[in-house]
């Protein structure tokens, strides 16, 4: 069972940056040296064992290094509905520095990305140690973390949630990629092989699921 104070519900949608900032704040109250993984819900993981290995390897990396580590998948087709990460210099193992992020390019650019061999799909999964994550949020999104740190430090989880319901709607509507990851200059990407599909669109669902003889998904 998951304790109640480990379950946090955003009162309104404000992109991934504010929600992750709140989650990191709560986690740091329990363990300031923790490593965390941010996992979007609208996706499919095909190979659980490979995913578990990639996550454990990634956790070990961010516990030893102050980096954001995104998880990328080598693309199998030119998919304009996905985000893409351009890889840069090699760091270690299957980990590389990130050169660029591109969100949902048109089909022609997606095809160029795939043909170049320099890009992986952006799964939206990323890892970091909590200390470095909070340091970066304090630098790049101070209006998010400063109020959490100064005004909720002595609050109970229920009191903190009351504070969030009041203040969360005025937080910036930003993804963590555009709000933080693209600004640090030292984000890394792991080339993963666990099999992945984005289920955020009907097309993504169609591509991920088996088809019948008429090429339909039921």
Model-identified regions with their sequence ranges:
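A short, charged helix-loop
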Residues: 87-120, 155
């Amino acid at each position: 069972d998951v304790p109640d104070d480990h379950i946090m519900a955003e009162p309104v949608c404000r992109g991934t940056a504010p929600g992750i900032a709140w989650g990191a704040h709560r986690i740091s109250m329990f363990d300031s040296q923790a490593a965390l993984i941010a996992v979007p819900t609208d996706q499919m993981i095909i190979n659980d064992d490979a995913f578990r290995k990639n996550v454990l390897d990634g956790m070990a990396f961010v516990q030893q290094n102050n980096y954001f580590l995104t998880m990328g998948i080598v693309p199998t087709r030119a998919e304009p509905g996905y985000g893409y990460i351009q890889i840069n210099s090699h760091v270690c193992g299957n980990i590389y520095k990130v050169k660029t992020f591109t969100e949902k390019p048109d089909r022609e650019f997606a095809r160029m990305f795939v043909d170049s061999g320099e890009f992986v799909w952006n799964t939206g999964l990323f890892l970091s140690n909590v200390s470095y994550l909070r340091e970066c949020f304090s630098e790049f999104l101070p209006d998010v973390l400063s109020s959490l740190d100064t005004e909720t430090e002595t609050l109970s989880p229920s009191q903190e949630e009351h504070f969030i319901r009041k203040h969360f709607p005025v937080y910036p509507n930003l993804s963590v990629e555009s709000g933080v990851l693209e600004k640090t200059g030292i984000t890394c990407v792991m080339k993963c092989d666990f099999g992945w599909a984005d289920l955020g669109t009907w097309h993504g669902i169609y591509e991920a699921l088996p088809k019948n003889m008429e090429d339909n998904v039921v």
